Amino acid sequence: MEDVDLGKDRTQLIDFVYANGNGSASNLNNRNNIPLSEKAAKEPLQTQPQEAPPAPKPKVQKQKPPVKPKKRIACSPGSAICLFLLAVAAIIFAAFLGHYLTKQNYEMMQFKSANESMTTCKNFTRSHKKHQDIVNEEDADENASIKQPTKEELALPKNVQPVWYDVSLSPKVGGNGTMGLAHVKLNIEEPTNKIVLNAKDIEFTRNLEKIQLSKEVTKRAKKSVDSGTNSTSEMPEGSGEEAMATTATTTTTESTTPVSSFVDTGIKVTNIEFDENLEKVTLTLDQELKKGSTVVLKIPFTSKVSNNNGLKEYKYKNSEGKEQSMFTTQPSYSYLRHVFPSFDQEAFKAPAAITLMHSKGSIVVANTGVKTKDDGDAQTSTLNKVLDPDFVIGDLVASEVNTTSGITIRIWTRPEVKHSTEQSLDYANQAIDAMEHILQSRLESKSLDIVAVPGFQTGNRVSPSFIVLPEEDILYNEQSNDINQKTRIARMISNRIAAQWFGGITNPEEFGTFWLNEALPRFLEVEALEKILDINSDDLWTYEMEKILERDATATSQPLRVKNVFSSADIAEIDHEFIGKKGAAVLRMIQKSVGVNVFNKAIRSFVSSYRSAYPYDDGLWKSFEKALGGKLKGWNNEPLDVAKFVNTWVDQIGFPLVSVEKLDDETVELSQERFKNDHKTKEQFKFRNAKYWFNWEVPLFLKSSGPVGNVSWLHEAFRLPLNTSDSIYLNTDSNGVYRVNYEEKRWNDIAKQLEKSHGKLSERTRARLISDVFALANSGALPFETALNVTSYLPMETATVPWLIATRIFKKLTERLEGAPIQDKLNSFIYQKIHKKFEEISSSPGEASSNYLKNRLYANLLDLMAIVKPEKSNEKLNELFVEGFLAPCQFSGNFSSDCSEVPGDLREKVYCNGVEFGNDTVFETVRELAEKEVDGAEKDLLQNSLACFRDPRALRRLILDNLNSTSTVTLLLRKMNSRPVGKEIATNWIIDNWSTVLKKKFKNDPETLNAIADAGIILDNEREKSMIETFMEHHHKSTHGIESLDKKIEEATTDIYWRKQKINELNDYLDGKMKGPAKDDEMESSEEQE
């Protein structure tokens, strides 16, 4: 059946099969019963026999009346001339009337346009239409060639320089756009008759008279001042700095205050052109602006609020079920051009003062000072000048706490969830204390505002003293949440607070240099987590290193330092999360190589002396050289050059596989090569010829039972003295970002040692051995028998980290072999390994509920038990769902976070299982509870459980209904792909709706398309892989740059190849046909026979 392509009939078949399980088949059948019309029901069918018709009666012929002679109508010449003149007069009158009405209509349109209409400005120079062949595709523009703009094309001309912005904005609820008016003061550096600004998704007026150029005139108004001591606030114009209080003693005098006014220059705008690709708007003037002059540009506009960069509206429902909105700037790269027309490039930075018109009762929180006045039915808030304005408008209230260093932390939330911020305040307080201790530095500001926005999508920008986070990453409910939510809050807050010390990326061109802006907060968040929740950072890194290594072993991986990034399309291709996590792992490897004390000393020196240096990362490596003082030697026995060491890890993709090969009884050789999951997919051309030819400077972290000398680094292959009786281990405690391979015999010896005395190796070393041996077996470098033998000792393992790695590997095996003939054998094998550990953790749930890593292990074991023993798992989960959720919540009218009695760490699985095996009534109950829930974490759990339902039609509606929230729809798609029915729906829905829904809605947002494709597409076989490849060919323009699609194809290629190569080998092992590790005497006898 796998090779049969059912096309659209396949989707209908899925609908019919799964809908029956929910009692919905009747609806489907009723739709197919189309009643006959009354006429069709009464008339007999033509094929039925009929009686012969009666014979016709003879017709009686009637006599025809005599034909009358025709009358001729005559017209005199005079009458004809009169008729002709009347016709001419009618034509002239009709022409005059048409002209008059057209003129009136045109003048009315001009009047409306001048006063209220705003239209998208396009290039008025239109190309002539040419004949084009009909394209047999859904979108004709898919055939257009893909051309990325160059750096020079994207750059703004330097003949005009902004001094300041004064912008008024009036956001409208419901995605109706933001009406705005911008005043921009400009210095003219070179003579020009054009002004070029950045603009994206902004509409301009056609009434060019509304766009004005003025001169700023400063007048002085007199003001009386009494003698005495006066306090004033001074702010240098255009500086963007905070006001500085000054005190002076004066006598009674008259002081003067400068007041600015604007006088029209008489220069007119004759044309306005918009270039969508370059994100520029060009104003053409009727006169040339002179060098050295200063003008103020006034331009009205309307900006969108529905995109994912710039100003965005987030909708939610309050506790009474009323829909409300919050508006917030979306802090990402080059975002000002989405809010108002601006010179949105690093070389043209200028402070902006923002005036916001908003509804009465709402609050404005910003990264600068805010003054609000009441205008009756509305309010006006004015933001002080700042380089990168960042703000939130909404119904907000604050909770606050003061740190020991005197910083006031305020967390702003909706009024109905204010009580759930106590935990976040405490974690923010501890995070600042932890950062101040690690960095030996304090924040420059004495206040920090953290705003919680429902459904917010976290960006990469950092605003001083101002943080915006998703509400679900802030709120904690003691009754409904668990250790996972505590960890989620602590990590997110620690990450964003750490970023306050290091700044953020404000311009695409900086990304190549500023990779550390992602990595440093990631690294420090784990350090802070150890202080806040007592989570061992080394254990956590060992577990989380798995995803980093798996991703980096693919052909679609990316280097940490990405250069030549100029546009938003380039940025969309960058995997920010991966770069941040791998970068943090590299920083940890540096820490383990140089020592904690030296590392902290270097970081502190960087914060105090080099943080503002450019290039940014050069300052950090100088700090390390200073802290090391030439004491640590590198691979060449010279003082370690930290910059060169790190460059080998950040300028090329992937990581090394260090191989240990025994040459004879007294010598081993160490060598390195790039490790890949397989070699079926090629890297992007620009990454194939790596800068260092896939050679790294590798810290070995070596442990040996015999003398091997002072060995710390691997650069080129070299040999070590090692006797046969001695053992050697590399990358102990999982400190390095690489894998290690030993000879097959050595792996078998390791398996025996683990069975005999696994405690002699640290738990992180044991975890790294399990991870490496399975990665090597999956890649074909080792037999799978060798990897499975290493797990023989697992029933005796008591530590958490090795089990975390093993359960993750077992789960991946079950996913790859789902539906395969050996699935039952594999399930029995895994059950024998895990059932004792599962019973052990289940018997003491209190420990798992308070320890994050043990809680993760419990979750992994529950997932595995649901696969290998589904009947036992489902019965228990269903019982919890009925008794702990439906019974107390279904008719109570309460919020789920208040009425649910299901333990917090089990809610995700219990809710999903209950919805999956429930009926339509259960689905609607959970949907209604999710809709009115005010607790962010509980709302997520309820919404995601809806994706477990088994009615395909309901799942499709669920995706469509949640497209306005990228974070929600991606979570739903991931959850669907974890269930058998949802997996059949998600990928097909994306393909079917790419042109009609997704591409249109997210036309200028490739990052969101990338996230949706990554979450929603799962490819399990050749047919599905071929389907996506064909889809990408037909939509090559809109899928260009969606790197998650290439990643999915590579993953599918790897899995398909793996199944072809490994199923027989695994079958033989599970059947007991393999002997296991060979003994020394057996190997010697086999060699003699050869």
From Swiss-Prot:
Region: Disordered, residue numbers: 21-71, 217-259, 1069-1090
Keyword hit for Transmembrane helix: yes
Any one GO cellular component localisation term in the record: cytoplasm
Cellular localisation: Membrane
InterPro entries per UniProt: Aminopeptidase_N-like_N (IPR045357), Aminopeptidase_N-like_N_sf (IPR042097), ERAP1-like_C_dom (IPR024571), Peptidase_M1_aminopeptidases (IPR050344), Peptidase_M1_dom (IPR014782), Peptidase_M4/M1_CTD_sf (IPR027268)
UniProt keyword annotations, A-Z: Glycoprotein, Membrane, Signal-anchor, Transmembrane, Transmembrane helix
Parts of the chain on the Cytoplasmic side: 1-77
Annotated GO MF terms: metalloaminopeptidase activity; peptide binding; zinc ion binding
Sequence ranges of Basic residues compositional bias: 59-71
Biased segments, Basic and acidic residues type: 1069-1080
One of the protein's GO biological processes: peptide catabolic process
Lumenal-side segments: 99-1090
Domain of life of the source: Eukaryota
Annotated TM spans: 78-98
Composition-biased stretches (Acidic residues): 1081-1090
Compositionally biased region (Low complexity): 21-33, 241-257
S-S pairs: none
Membrane topology: Single-pass type II membrane protein
Glycosylation sites: 115, 123, 143, 176, 230, 402, 710, 723, 789, 894, 919, 964, 993
Pfam families: ERAP1_C, Peptidase_M1, Peptidase_M1_N
Gene3D superfamilies: 1.25.50.20, 2.60.40.1910, Neutral Protease Domain 2 (1.10.390.10), tricorn interacting facor f3 domain (2.60.40.1730)
Family statement: Belongs to the peptidase M1 family.
PANTHER family attached to this UniProt entry: AMINOPEPTIDASE-LIKE PROTEIN AC3.5 (PTHR11533:SF201), PROTEASE M1 ZINC METALLOPROTEASE (PTHR11533)
Protein name listed in UniProt: Aminopeptidase-like protein AC3.5
Source organism of the structure: Caenorhabditis elegans
